[in-house]
């Protein structure tokens, strides 16, 4: 189908770059009656970040050649003959080292072979084997019923007490339980049982390696972890194991550093773009390019998706600024003008806005139109109507929240979340990523519009991102003058304490993950990359908001991980 066939002609943009005439009325921003955001300046050196675009590691070419040889060796390991449990453990290690994308087909083939094997003696009475098999199969799109855990229950229907001593089995059960669906009560019981008992023994585990794995899992289960972040931690952890495979470890290090060098060049180019926009000089909004690049790597780290990361990071950096305009800086009249301009996707009327807000708006238009132009040039598809629609919907949601604040209206939790799962902004990034990666035979005006309509998969992604954001940021945002968040909405609606409200929101997180998990198995019109993007944006949020607001404020844990994931290569042995 012709990509232009059903597109509204009004959405066909005549020029990529918008140039506005700024009148004296828009010349200065009055600070009178504007709320202060009190954001700290970015702690990142943008000159250094820009230099990453041209940095060259001469050893990298040598490592790439060595990595290709090691890759074939690892492929042979995966396909080799071994005991079923050993095969599962190897696949688990390969995935945790961040190498799943290199061996996708081999892993799926081996897991299918184990799944179709009629023999169950090797796993049916072994909690570790049963749980590891369950998790790996579900992670890779092969459904296994929860009933496989029934054999580990006693006559009263509770998990057998002797399992409390099986720490490795408990750990595998714990990780498996996070792939449960709504209504899978057995997995809920497994989560509670394994969590309680692992917490009871975590300080007394004799094996240092197993003890570290348990504490790491209790802090963040694998299913909720971003693959790239997890790989950086696990590479160091795997190196400490007694039975480490040296060539597998070496390949993981090589691959991590090779991908990191690609990310560094991308980050350098993005830093240059950011400085050229001039928006890095605006002090009333957040400067979050580095955080957004980390988020982009959580969403999709694989080298072949550089254009997806580039668009996602640019849009997310602008979204943070637009969000701050609506939440704190702009007057209600200015916000209505801003929303109208975006809704029309026409800069007529921009002279009614202050200069600083106009700069953000124009950069937003120019960036979106450039992304749309690249889509048309590279894929023959006009994506601008869909990107513009996503921006318009987002700004309308922001405006609704601003009106709530200015009028003193207190929404119910349900009303807040219905608006908030879109105002969290990930629909825009997901729409753009869909346009960039969907197969051309399936990419139509209607299919792109469907993504914009927030179907169930996108809805769960938005809801989880919103809940994580609120758990990490609500107190600070309300202190800045932002609208009530989910925690405060629940407190107002029910009279609950803040502690009780937080526990309720955490419960909603677990329930929303169950809905997301089920979506991953349901018939979907989406190709695999897009499905993964939805889940991975949530994993990025989990990281940034796990211990507070690691997004708006560059906390030590976010900066340390950013340095280890993006800046500092993994040290190699001298002979490498």
Swiss-Prot record:
Mg(2+) 3 binds at residues 469, 473, 477. InterPro entries: Isoprenoid_synthase_dom_sf (IPR008949), Terpene_cyclase-like_1_C (IPR034741), Terpene_cyclase_plant_C1 (IPR044814), Terpene_synth_N (IPR001906), Terpene_synth_N_sf (IPR036965), Terpene_synthase-like (IPR050148), Terpene_synthase_metal-bd (IPR005630), Terpenoid_cyclase/PrenylTrfase (IPR008930). Mg(2+) 1 binds at residues 323, 327. (2E)-geranyl diphosphate binds at residues 286, 323, 327, 466, 469. Mg(2+) 2 binds at residues 323, 327. Its cofactor is Mg(2+); Mn(2+). It comes from the Eukaryota. One of its GO terms (biological process) is terpenoid biosynthetic process. It catalyses: (2E,6E)-farnesyl diphosphate = beta-bisabolene + diphosphate; (2E)-geranyl diphosphate + H2O = (R)-alpha-terpineol + diphosphate; (2E)-geranyl diphosphate = (4S)-limonene + diphosphate. Pfam families: Terpene_synth, Terpene_synth_C. A motif (DDXXD motif) lies at residues 323-327. Keywords: Lyase, Magnesium, Manganese, Metal-binding. Pathway: Secondary metabolite biosynthesis; terpenoid biosynthesis. The keyword rRNA-binding does not apply. GO terms for molecular function: (4S)-limonene synthase activity; magnesium ion binding; terpene synthase activity. Its EC number is 4.2.3.112, 4.2.3.16, 4.2.3.-. CDD domains: Terpene_cyclase_plant_C1 (cd00684). The Asp-Asp-Xaa-Xaa-Asp/Glu (DDXXD/E) motif is important for the catalytic activity, presumably through binding to Mg(2+). Monoterpene synthase which catalyzes the conversion of (2E)-geranyl diphosphate (GPP) to (R)-alpha-terpineol and (4S)-limonene, as well as small quantities of linalool, myrcene, (-)-alpha-pinene, (+)-sabinene and geraniol. To a lower extent, catalyzes the conversion of (2E,6E)-farnesyl diphosphate (FPP) to beta-bisabolene. Belongs to the terpene synthase family. Tpsb subfamily. This is (+)-alpha-terpineol synthase.
């Amino acid at each position: 189908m012709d990509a232009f066939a059903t597109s509204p002609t009004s959405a066909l943009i005549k020029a990529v770059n918008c140039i506005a005439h700024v009148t004296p009325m828009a010349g200065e921003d009055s600070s009178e009656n504007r709320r202060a955001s009190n954001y700290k300046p970015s702690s990142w050196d943008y000159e250094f970040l820009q230099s990453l675009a041209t940095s060259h590691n001469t050893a990298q070419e040598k490592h790439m050649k060595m990595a290709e040889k090691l890759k074939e060796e690892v492929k042979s390991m995966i396909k080799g003959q071994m005991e079923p449990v050993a095969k599962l453990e190897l696949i688990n290690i390969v995935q945790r080292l961040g190498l799943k994308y290199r061996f996708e087909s081999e892993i799926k083939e081996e897991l299918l072979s184990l799944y179709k094997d009629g023999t169950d003696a090797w796993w049916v009475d072994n909690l570790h084997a049963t749980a590891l098999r369950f998790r790996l199969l579900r992670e890779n799109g092969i459904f296994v019923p929860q009933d496989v855990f029934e054999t580990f229950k006693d006559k009263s229907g509770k998990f057998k007490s002797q399992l409390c001593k099986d720490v490795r089995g408990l750990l595998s059960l714990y990780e498996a339980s996070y792939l449960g669906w709504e209504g899978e009560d057995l997995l809920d019981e497994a989560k509670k049982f394994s969590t309680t008992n692992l917490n009871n023994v975590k300080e007394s585990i004799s094996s240092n390696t197993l003890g570290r794995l348990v504490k790491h899992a209790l802090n963040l289960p694998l299913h909720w972890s971003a693959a790239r972040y997890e790989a950086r931690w696990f590479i160091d952890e795997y190196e400490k194991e007694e039975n480490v495979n040296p060539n597998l470890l070496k390949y993981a290090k090589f691959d991590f550093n090779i991908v990191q060098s690609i990310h560094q060049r991308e980050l350098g180019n993005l830093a240059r773009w950011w400085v050229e926009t001039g928006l890095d000089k605006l002090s009333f909004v957040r400067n979050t390019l580095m955080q957004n690049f980390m988020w982009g790597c959580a969403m999709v780290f694989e080298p072949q998706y550089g254009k997806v990361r580039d668009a996602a990071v640019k849009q997310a950096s602008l979204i943070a600024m637009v969000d701050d305009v609506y939440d704190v800086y702009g007057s209600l009249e200015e916000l209505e003008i801003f929303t109208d301009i975006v809704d029309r996707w026409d800069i007529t009327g921009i002279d009614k806005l202050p200069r600083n807000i106009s700069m953000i708006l124009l950069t937003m238009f120019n960036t979106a139109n450039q992304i749309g132009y690249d889509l048309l040039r590279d894929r023959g598809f006009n994506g601008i109507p869909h990107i513009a629609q996503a921006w318009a919907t987002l700004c309308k949601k922001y405006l609704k929240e601003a009106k709530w604040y200015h009028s003193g209206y207190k929404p119910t939790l349900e009303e807040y979340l219905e608006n908030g799962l879109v105002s969290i902004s990930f629909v825009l990034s997901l729409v753009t990523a869909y346009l960039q990666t969907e197969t051309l035979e399936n990419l139509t005006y209607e299919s792109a519009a469907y993504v914009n309509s927030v179907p169930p998969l996108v809805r769960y992604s938005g809801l989880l991102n919103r809940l994580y954001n609120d758990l990490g940021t609500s107190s600070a945002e309300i202190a800045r003058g932002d609208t009530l968040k989910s925690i405060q909405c629940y407190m107002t609606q029910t009279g609950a304490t803040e502690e009780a409200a937080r526990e309720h929101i955490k419960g909603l997180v677990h329930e929303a993950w169950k809905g997301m998990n089920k979506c991953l198995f349901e018939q979907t019109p989406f190709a695999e990359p897009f499905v993964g993007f939805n889940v991975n944006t949530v994993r990025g949020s989990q990281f940034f908001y796990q211990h507070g607001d690691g997004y708006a404020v560059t906390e030590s844990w976010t900066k340390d991980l950013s340095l280890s994931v993006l800046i500092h290569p993994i040290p190699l042995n001298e002979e490498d």
